[in-house]
Amino acid sequence: MTDLTATPAPAEPAASAYDPTAKQKAQAKTARIPIKIVPIEKLKKPEWIRVKAATGSSRFNEIKTILREHNLHTVCEEASCPNIGECFGKGTATFMIMGDKCTRRCPFCDVGHGRPDPLDADEPKNLARTIAALKLKYVVITSVDRDDLRDGGAGHFVECIREVREQSPATRIEILTPDFRGRLDRALEILNAAPPDVMNHNLETVPRLYKEARPGSDYAHSLKLLKDFKALHPDVATKSGLMVGLGETTDEILQVMRDLRAHDVDMLTIGQYLQPSEHHLPVREYVHPDTFKMYEEEAYKMGFTHAAVGAMVRSSYHADLQAHGAGVV
């Protein structure tokens, strides 16, 4: 068996080549994180990891065309989601607002890093117009991290929610937010103006792995965001998601689930982490379906109103069905 743990990491880009305004992906993005990624032997994907390839179906192409026409982004494309073919083919998408350059460098994520562009004042109207044109009954709106904004982007979320409700009143709205770190109280106050139907913020992984997987984020802060929002809006469902396969233990995942319930989170998603490229964190385990089933059973025992748990589950995958299962729609 080949041991790749001693393989030197690729050389960092020369300082003179660094352009903070450019969108950095893969090696360019992860080269500057505090904990370097050390390659390990790539695990063979088991038979239960099956992804439907993106196709050239008319609905798939229609959605991509409309998105480009309105200068919109989806996390499905930017984060290289494995379910993009199925979701686009069924006419669903998770819209990513505030640009396609994130101020964070999370090494599990394939969204590009860089100095963000100014907010697009037309984006809320373009987003709402697109949702109305596609006749979507349920949408997920997420964003890159915008640590450059005083409100973390909360005001832009509110503008998008208002425009969607104006142009497509029957559409239910889930927002998947960044952590608003350093500006949480301000962000929550702003969100009071137009709360969503579902408030989602992902913990992503267990606290022991935060420094490696989520540099710039804080586990306790993310829990506080969810709890504080729920205290302000007890009738709005709260939701969070986790990845497995990064080196966490079963007991650690169960403890995170207990932490979420202790912070009044209603809905849960758990899915298998898949490495976007060799420059991202490696997959350390492909979790067996029996373990996913155990997590699902434990989630309902703990009191979650809905738990979507499985290898190919993602936070916004079949979000409409998740919300329906939780009694939201």
Swiss-Prot record:
Pathway: Protein modification; protein lipoylation via endogenous pathway; protein N(6)-(lipoyl)lysine from octanoyl-[acyl-carrier-protein]: step 2/2
Intracellular or extracellular location(s): Cytoplasm
Span list, region Disordered: 1-23
Co-factor note (free text): Binds 2 [4Fe-4S] clusters per subunit. One cluster is coordinated with 3 cysteines and an exchangeable S-adenosyl-L-methionine.
Main location: cytoplasm
Protein EC: 2.8.1.8
PROSITE patterns, per the entry: RADICAL_SAM (PS51918)
Keywords: 4Fe-4S, Cytoplasm, Iron, Iron-sulfur, Metal-binding, S-adenosyl-L-methionine, Transferase
Binding site for [4Fe-4S] cluster 2: C102, C106, C109
CDD domains assigned: Radical_SAM (cd01335)
Catalytic reaction list: [[Fe-S] cluster scaffold protein carrying a second [4Fe-4S](2+) cluster] + N(6)-octanoyl-L-lysyl-[protein] + 2 oxidized [2Fe-2S]-[ferredoxin] + 2 S-adenosyl-L-methionine + 4 H(+) = [[Fe-S] cluster scaffold protein] + N(6)-[(R)-dihydrolipoyl]-L-lysyl-[protein] + 4 Fe(3+) + 2 hydrogen sulfide + 2 5'-deoxyadenosine + 2 L-methionine + 2 reduced [2Fe-2S]-[ferredoxin]
One Pfam family per UniProt: LIAS_N
SMART domains recorded: Elp3 (SM00729)
Cofactor field: [4Fe-4S] cluster
Family indicated by similarity: Belongs to the radical SAM superfamily. Lipoyl synthase family.
Protein name, entry field: Lipoyl synthase
Organism, as annotated: Burkholderia thailandensis (strain ATCC 700388 / DSM 13276 / CCUG 48851 / CIP 106301 / E264)
The organism's taxonomic lineage, starting at the top: Bacteria, Pseudomonadati, Pseudomonadota, Betaproteobacteria, Burkholderiales
